[in-house]
Amino acid sequence: MINYSERIPNNVNLNENKTLQRALEQWQPSFLNWWDDMGPENSSNYDVYLRTAVSVDPKGWADFGYVKMHDYRWGIFLAPQEGEKKITFGEHKGQDVWQEVPGEYRSTLRRIIVTQGDTEPASVEQQRHLGLTAPSLYDLRNLFQVNVEEGRHLWAMVYLLHAHFGRDGREEGEALLERRSGDEDNPRILTAFNEKTPDWLSFFMFTFITDRDGKFQLASLAESAFDPLARTCKFMLTEEAHHLFVGESGIARVIQRTCEVMKELGTDDPAKLRAAGVIDLPTLQKYLNFHYSVTSDLYGAEISSNAATYYTNGLKGRFEEEKIGDDHKLQNSEYEVMDVAGDKILTRHVPALSALNERLRDDWITDVQAGVDRWNRIPAKFGFDFRFTLPHKGFHRKIGMFADVHVSPDGRLISEAEWTHQHKNWLPTESDRLYVHSLMGRCLEPGKFANWIAAPARGINNQPVNFEYVRFN
């Protein structure tokens, strides 16, 4: 018998719920088999300095200590219940939130939970080789922290499936462990989660940009009228903040190191900087363009009847719904979207309900831009003119209005011929990727960092930068 509060830290009264115990007991061995097969490569023996969620108390929700990842205590936590909580948007606005799934929304809610749940193991699979080329112990530990928390987020979604969706939910829980990122026959649900994450530059961009999509999706589900889903996502957001920090600070340290070498050598010539073993800023810009455009597609089409239905039915709200000053029903509201008309990109107003994907994408863009602005302080501090910019939202898109046209980063509609000629200046080329790949060698001495990345300003949980974050046995 498993001691539930110890083996699976939780605040869902697992000890009392025999049906749920049985379901999770069957699922747990499959999960551990998946982790051993598809989790971080060659890492089963490492003792890693990790935080583990142990409660939802803001002051002490996490414990830090050394743990083998296979033995990590993947817990199930929902943010605390809020008194007599009411639905805040859609046609049910003002009614009590739901503690059980209404029959008419059962299949839609299940699909929403499965789609979100599928991204969690997918990113672990995408990142499983990265430990073999970690630029430092500090970074290796951060990678593993992100991985175990993606694993915990999978547990959180599987808990909802098991607790509220009966046999269908149990089958979906198994299927979440059977799909594989990039697999031809049984891929992950969303395209971006079938892309490779071949190097640490891609990993930092992914955690900065694509995990930020996760933040906005979770935040809109945290508004849901289905209270267990809302509370689950609210607590997941607490952990997601560290993932975004890993990405933003990781790229900032790459920029810092490149600027140091630019100053030493008195040049911004990419060839000379590459000869010195750092990543030139234009190459970083190309990686930014790539990850930004691929992630933008995750929001779906600009005009979406699905998004309108989810909102009207109370299943998925807007980012920070309660802070928005409107009627929260949107029957008569409009929202501005871009449109391709002949050889021009115009804007037009459409019913706000149909443009909820675009609104969430715009909220995400504002947040990404704030991070890019922080990066731009680094070259400015060194006295360099280079600034990172986000490409036009029509650039390199495969979904929505811009799927069938070519748009340059500065927002011009261009011909197939110009795209073919120019895209190598805007997106990473094979030789860019090979160069970045050539820098990826393991650097595992405490306090030492690979040549292409600067040390962080401080360590994790008040530990020094040269702390032994991972012990190899």
Swiss-Prot record:
Its EC number is 1.14.13.208. It catalyses: benzoyl-CoA + NADPH + O2 + H(+) = 2,3-epoxy-2,3-dihydrobenzoyl-CoA + NADP(+) + H2O. Induction: By benzoate. GO terms for cellular component: cytosol. The keyword Phosphoprotein does not apply. Its cofactor is Fe cation. It comes from the Bacteria. Disulfide bonds: none annotated. SUPFAM superfamilies: Ferritin-like. Coiled coil: none annotated. One of its GO terms (biological process) is phenylacetate catabolic process. It is an enzyme of class 1 (oxidoreductase). InterPro entries: Aromatic_CoA_ox/epox, Benzoyl_CoA_Oase_BoxB, Ferritin-like_SF, RNR-like. The keyword Iron applies. Monomer. The subunit composition of the active BoxA/BoxB protein complex is not known. Belongs to the benzoyl-CoA oxygenase component B family. This is Benzoyl-CoA oxygenase component B. It comes from Aromatoleum evansii.
